[in-house]
Amino acid sequence: MPDAVKVGFVPFSTASRGTLVVFCDETLKFGRAAGKALGSSAGLVKRAAAANQFKGKSATTLDILAPEGLKADRLIVVGVGKTPALKSSDFLKLGGVIAGKVRSDNNGVTIIAELPSATMEPDLSASLASGIRLRAYKFDRYKTRKKEGDDAVNRADVSIAVADVAAAKKAFAPVNHVVNGVIIARDLVNEPPNVLYPEEFARRASRLRAMGVGIDVLDVKAMTKLGMGALLGVGQGSARPSRTVVMRWNGGKKGEPPVAFVGKGVCFDTGGISIKPANGMEEMKGDMGGAACVVGLMHALAARKAKVNAIGAIGIVENMPDGSAQRPGDIVTSMSGQTIEIINTDAEGRLVLADVLWYVARKFKPKVMIDLATLTGAIMVALGTEHAGLFSNNDELSERLTRAGLDTGERVWRMPLAPEYDKLIDSKFADMKNTGGRHGGSITAAQFLQRFVDDTPWAHLDIAGTAMGAPKSDINQSWGSGFGVRLLDRLVAEHYETKR
């Protein structure tokens, strides 16, 4: 998708035309540059605030015609609340709030990025710019008739006025690459399934070659030779052949074990022979949200030249019913040699992940391995749409993911793993079965995956409630959210990049 908005940094002295945006705290105090820009109009603005009961609380806005004397036509005052408590994630949200207010403004927007009572560091300006871009995103490439104003955001030119332009640009550069990764993930999730099928998904992931990412695409013949019977069983009812794509970024020390990310990529999930209800089935185009995140993350790591060795692996299939489709009662042999009784063909994502997890663990011996999957409806019953489910065999990794989630706003909540749950997936006829019954469904799904990771420090993120169809937020108005890219990039940056 073309970029929805142009964002740049300019000095405080830049003239403000079109819309002027300034910040104030709960005392309605403005920063020095904003006060200078407002001049004698500051008193009028405060009277307008009183008339509109605007109190400067965080993320609230006062939107008025610019008072006489300002070069701007429109003035938006954005509350920041109590400034000492502000964090980077707060400015991400504020950027989204501003983008939501100026979508229809094609006369230019200038934001004076200055706090009333504190210095606004370059990283906060970078977060502000990121929030603007994330909120401005929309997916409308298949609309041939557009309502008046639909394209206004494409003409929005946002200038962020800062004290140090060079420092702001430097801070924004790596963050902007991460935003691009989120947008890539959103685009993939939003694509219709007749356009984004396994072969096409593999082609799009392969575009990362141009950024220095090593790419291996395993076709059906290669996966058959490897013994990936669990993954191949899922796709055998589809006319679209399955693929596994392995992406390698070598930005760390030579020979250092990589961090690995594995994504579920079911491009469309009918449920197979255990077919889903027709109502809402169209949303199963997003059942590849985990794989989309991994591709977006690998883009971000490569684009910002992350000092880490990283593996991204995605298993890409369609789960369709036909005469050759997998049946309930079938027994398949996974790459690990473990056998699996198929109880429900709609519990297919764990079968895909089982083979890819085993392949990555054995071939690359990663220091940590994290998988992402829109795996279970049960996690939505447990956690709703505000947290992803986190399952892990490693406390340190779990704590790091939780912290990264709090820092980025992509929050996770740890769920239990225990032998009592694991025994629920034992089978009378095979080593295990692919469902463990009605209760604790997200837990038994994670227990299934754990059988394919050996002793690798591992975490599973069930993103069924956060990757697609989640409630709209200040930084996302799209059906596909791109959840996980910012979370995992933060994890890598904080804990796994080489310090040079």
UniProtKB/Swiss-Prot annotation:
Pfam families noted in UniProt: Peptidase_M17, Peptidase_M17_N
Gene: pepA
The organism's place on the tree of life at top rank: Bacteria
Keywords, comma-separated and alphabetical: Aminopeptidase, Cytoplasm, Hydrolase, Manganese, Metal-binding, Protease
Catalytic activity: Release of an N-terminal amino acid, Xaa-|-Yaa-, in which Xaa is preferably Leu, but may be other amino acids including Pro although not Arg or Lys, and Yaa may be Pro. Amino acid amides and methyl esters are also readily hydrolyzed, but rates on arylamides are exceedingly low; Release of an N-terminal amino acid, preferentially leucine, but not glutamic or aspartic acids
Protein name from the UniProt record: Probable cytosol aminopeptidase
Uppermost EC category: hydrolase
Species name: Nitrobacter winogradskyi (strain ATCC 25391 / DSM 10237 / CIP 104748 / NCIMB 11846 / Nb-255)
Transit peptide as UniProt keyword: no
